Design a protein with these regions (language model features):
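A short, N-terminal "cap"/entry segment at the start of jelly-roll beta-barrel domains
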Residues: 1-45, 132-177
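Ligand-binding loop in jelly-roll beta-barrel domains
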Residues: 100-129
């Protein structure tokens, strides 16, 4: 059985893998080091992550989740959280709730302090998930797939904009059966 305890003071944070690192102008605004804790803990329906933001950076674009709920506990540092049309100052000890929904629940944490901002992120792990990005007009579809030959789960990911939508029948003029 997986040991159901992890001490967050003994966890190593790592930057995003190169394939998910922000590039170009986005690199000026986003940086995140994190440790994913759910699988090492053996969690099935909740996700846990320890996150660290350097001064002046956000970890993710302003986004909402249609299925999953998130909660953040600020462990150290200070910053701000933008939720919908409002922005709130945050500091050590603050607990932030981000329920599922549309643009009114979109959220983003930014480090506006002078030292590292650390927080624990907790979320439900429902799938598939649809995220919306109100600032850029994008949406993302995410789903975990069956494990591959290596035993690791597969992943489906699509990022787009509504105007890129295909007609349901596009490309279906061929063999009907």
């Amino acid at each position: 059985m997986t040991r159901p305890i992890v001490n967050i003071h003994e966890v190593s944070l790592v930057p995003r893998p190169a394939e998910f690192a922000p590039e170009g102008p986005a690199a000026e605004h986003f940086a995140l080091s994190s440790a994913q804790l759910a699988r090492p803990l053996g969690a099935k329906k909740l996700g846990y992550g320890l996150c660290a933001l350097p001064p002046g950076k956000a970890g993710y674009p302003f986004h909402s989740h249609r299925e999953n709920e998130e909660m953040f506990l600020v462990l150290q540092g200070s910053g701000e959280v933008r939720i919908g049309a409002e922005t709130y100052p945050i500091r050590e000890g603050d607990l932030i709730a981000c329920p599922p929904g549309g643009p009114e629940t979109a959220h983003q944490i930014r480090n506006t302090g002078t030292a590292e901002l650390r927080y624990l992120a907790v979320s439900t792990r429902l799938g598939p998930e649809i995220c919306e990005y109100p600032d850029s007009g994008k949406f993302g579809v995410y789903a975990e797939l069956a494990p591959g030959k290596d035993g690791k789960p597969g992943y489906f990911y699509f990022m787009g904009r509504p105007e890129q939508q295909l007609d349901y029948w596009a490309g279906e003029g061929g063999n009907p059966g």
